[in-house]
């Protein structure tokens, strides 16, 4: 809620994955049965969906987005609501924020590729800060946000294998071969 998932999807993923499926299990199951590539936007990473997709022959990718502080998300949602956007219970945002962060370490175990973005407002927009391939950290920015450091700690220090500052594009998506 308020991390910038829809903005990133609209700007970078919509063309490749026009089928954005809501978190409704029967729609996800139908897409898997039909072997359609699709994207899913949710607050937490659905590891069961990732496993089902892998079992069905999909290559799975998670695009995870967070901010430094859930109060930033609250502010974004208030602005969206003031402009006629969806009304949300603001009191649930801090808990949802923490739940989302807790899902990231599990996501790396269940997805083929995990791209991690920070969207803390600093004039940079969505900033790729880490990447995991098959559970292994392969890229990390030299200026990791504190929320990422809290999750992965020492693993981030000196573990980047493919470069210091990754470049590129809270969505998880699966794509069929």
Predicted regions and their residues:
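Conserved phosphate-donor/acceptor-positioning beta-strand/loop module used by diverse small-molecule
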Residues: 56-77
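Hydrophobic anchor at the start of a short beta-strand
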Residues: 38, 57-61, 114
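Conserved substrate/cofactor phosphate-moiety recognition/catalytic segment
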Residues: 3-40
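Conserved GTP-binding G-domain of TRAFAC-class P-loop NTPases and closely related GTPase folds
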Residues: 79-173
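Positively charged, amphipathic and often flexible ligand-engagement surfaces
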Residues: 10, 56-59, 99
């Amino acid at each position: 809620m308020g991390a910038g998932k829809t903005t990133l999807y609209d700007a970078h993923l919509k063309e490749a994955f026009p089928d954005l499926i809501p978190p409704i299990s029967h729609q996800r199951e139908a897409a898997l049965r039909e072997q359609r590539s699709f994207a899913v936007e949710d607050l937490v990473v659905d590891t069961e969906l990732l496993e089902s997709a892998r079992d069905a022959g999909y290559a799975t990718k998670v695009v995870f987005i967070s901010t430094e502080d859930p109060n930033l998300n609250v502010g974004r949602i208030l602005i969206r609501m003031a402009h006629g956007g969806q009304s949300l219970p603001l009191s649930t945002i801090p808990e949802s924020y923490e739940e989302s962060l807790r899902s990231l370490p599990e996501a790396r175990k269940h997805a083929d590729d995990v791209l991690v973005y920070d969207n803390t407002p600093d004039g940079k927009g969505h900033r790729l800060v880490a990447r995991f391939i098959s559970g292994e950290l392969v890229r990390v920015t030299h200026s990791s946000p504190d929320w990422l450091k809290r999750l992965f700690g020492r693993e981030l220090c000196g573990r980047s294998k493919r470069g210091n500052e990754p470049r590129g594009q809270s969505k998880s998506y699966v794509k069929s071969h």
